[in-house]
């Protein structure tokens, strides 16, 4: 029987597959998803983690015997038993069929439809309408298959049911209102049957089905839509092409979108930004090498090594420190959705990574939370106005320039960069943090 540790971030639907499978098989799976044991975006980028899981992705599973495996479907398969995998060659093939179908056919339209309602992806009306029709087709396909069946393969729950249910989960919770889903009674019956099994409930809790289809918040995210009068930037700059190959490789590594969240469709959409000239080219050279600090921060102890290095080398004339706070805390509900706001902002600022560093923290609990952070920017002004590509999210935050020499700034930098401290100015407990680097 498998036993080990699952590394993930909170409320990761991909991790649910393995956790539900373990409930059926009896596999002993410990979950590390929050500080201090696992800092998503930090722990999974350390050399030790990457030696075990080269892709840096989560979920990732480390067995008590040292066996390591990543990719959610592979982990779910590993912690399953023979009944879940398919007890005959034919059944096993059908299980793989539905697992593959979930990834190839369900995930893309589900992401296109659901992600904008969660605030983690740009909204495109035509793409959303196409996604709705594709979801309708998929539900109809499932409905026909389940007309004479209780489960997708055989007479018992298998990995096929677990995988497809988890892939459909946010559709049912976020957008499949009664009028939309009523045309698929067999699919609904099967979905409800599965989520009410004790093994599913132990992981998912009580799943509340959507009552009213969630919509894209046009007022809040209108600025994410392309502006017709905004000219396209040039695809590259002479300075960029003339840089040494080693430096270009280092920048590419620093600027690459984090792969570990596995939200492929969302990441592809958010990363598809046009290349632009360097908005910081006009600034004089600085003695502070941000990449070197980032290496210290990633590979050394924050309090004893990285922070002393930061203050010893920080160039207050060439760089500036800023405190940010989300303007609309009353709109923050589920903590995982609040974290998605941070992740989405980081993805949209991908090209700013070479000239910025930040630690942004979610404080509090569901329906009582706040978001704030400390940022390091090249130059003395906020970087966002320098490029239209960076102006999507920053107006949703208040910004206050910090005095590098003040005791308040020293405390803020120490607490936010280390994720440790009293955070007395916040009034809520640390929940989780994300690093922009």
From Swiss-Prot:
Name the Pfam families on file.
EF1G (PF00647), GST_C (PF00043), GST_N (PF02798)
- PTM-bearing positions, type N-acetylalanine: 2
Cross-link Glycyl lysine isopeptide (Lys-Gly) (interchain with G-Cter in SUMO1) maps to: 253
What Gene3D superfamilies has UniProt attached to this entry? 1.20.1050.10, Glutaredoxin, Translation elongation factor EF1B, gamma chain, conserved domain
Acetylation: is it a keyword of this entry?
yes
Molecular function (Gene Ontology), one example = translation elongation factor activity
**Where is the sequence biased in composition, kind Basic and acidic residues?**
221-254
Record-annotated EF-1-gamma C-terminal domain positions: 276-437
**N6-acetyllysine occurs at which residues?**
147, 212, 401, 434
Q: Which residues cross the membrane?
A: none
Q: Where is the GST C-terminal domain?
A: 88-216
Cross-link Glycyl lysine isopeptide (Lys-Gly) (interchain with G-Cter in SUMO2), residue numbers? 285
Q: Which keywords fit this entry according to its UniProt record?
A: Acetylation, Elongation factor, Isopeptide bond, Protein biosynthesis, Ubl conjugation
Positions of the UniProt region annotated as Disordered: 221-268
Per the record, what is one GO cellular component? cytoplasm
Q: Which residues form the GST N-terminal domain?
A: 2-87
Task: Give the source's domain of life in one word.
Answer: Eukaryota
- Modification type N6-malonyllysine: residues: 434
* Subunit details: EF-1 is composed of four subunits: alpha, beta, delta, and gamma.
Query: Which PANTHER family does the entry link to?
Result: ELONGATION FACTOR 1-GAMMA
Q: What does this protein do?
A: Probably plays a role in anchoring the complex to other cellular components.
This chain belongs to the protein called Elongation factor 1-gamma
Gene for this protein? EEF1G
């Amino acid at each position: 029987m498998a036993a080990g540790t699952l590394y993930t971030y909170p409320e990761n639907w991909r991790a649910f597959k393995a956790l539900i499978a373990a409930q059926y098989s009896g596999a002993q799976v410990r979950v590390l998803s929050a500080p201090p044991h696992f800092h998503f975006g930090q722990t999974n980028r350390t050399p030790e983690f990457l030696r075990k899981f080269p892709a840096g992705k989560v979920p990732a599973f480390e067995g008590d015997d040292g066996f390591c495996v990543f990719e959610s479907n592979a982990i779910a398969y590993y912690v399953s038993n023979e009944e879940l995998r398919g007890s005959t060659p034919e059944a096993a093939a059908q299980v793989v069929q539905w697992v593959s179908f979930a990834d190839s056919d369900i995930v893309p339209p589900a992401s296109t439809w659901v992600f904008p309602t969660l605030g983690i992806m740009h909204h495109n009306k035509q793409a959303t309408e196409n996604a709705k029709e594709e979801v309708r087709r998929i539900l109809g396909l499932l409905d026909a298959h389940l007309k004479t069946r209780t489960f997708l393969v055989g007479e018992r729950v298998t990995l096929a049911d677990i995988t497809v249910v988890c892939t459909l989960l946010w559709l049912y919770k976020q957008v499949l209102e009664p009028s939309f889903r009523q045309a698929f009674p067999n699919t609904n019956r099967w979905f409800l049957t599965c989520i009410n099994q004790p093994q599913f409930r132990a992981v998912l809790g009580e799943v509340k089905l959507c009552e009213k289809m969630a919509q894209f918040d046009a007022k809040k995210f209108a600025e994410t839509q392309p502006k017709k009068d905004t000219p396209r930037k040039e695809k590259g700059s002479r300075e960029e092409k003339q840089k040494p190959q080693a430096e270009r490789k280092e920048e590419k590594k620093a600027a690459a979108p984090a792969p570990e969240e596995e939200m492929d469709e969302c990441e592809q959409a958010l990363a598809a930004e046009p290349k632009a000239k360097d908005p910081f080219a006009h600034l004089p050279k600085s003695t502070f090498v941000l990449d070197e600090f980032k290496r210290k921060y990633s590979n050394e102890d924050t309090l004893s090594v990285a922070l002393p290095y930061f203050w010893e080398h920080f160039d207050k004339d060439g760089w500036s420190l800023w405190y940010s706070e989300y303007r609309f805390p009353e709109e923050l509900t589920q903590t995982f959705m609040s974290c998605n706001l941070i992740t989405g902002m980081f993805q949209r600022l991908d090209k700013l990574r070479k000239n910025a560093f930040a630690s942004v923290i979610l404080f509090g609990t569901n329906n009582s939370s706040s978001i704030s952070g400390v940022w390091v920017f090249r130059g003395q002004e906020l970087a966002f106005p320098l490029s239209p590509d960076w102006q999507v999210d920053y107006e949703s935050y208040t910004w206050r320039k910090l005095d590098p020499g003040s005791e308040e700034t020293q405390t803020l930098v120490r607490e936010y960069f280390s994720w440790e401290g009293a955070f007395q100015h916040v009034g809520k407990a640390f929940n989780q943090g994300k690093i922009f680097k």
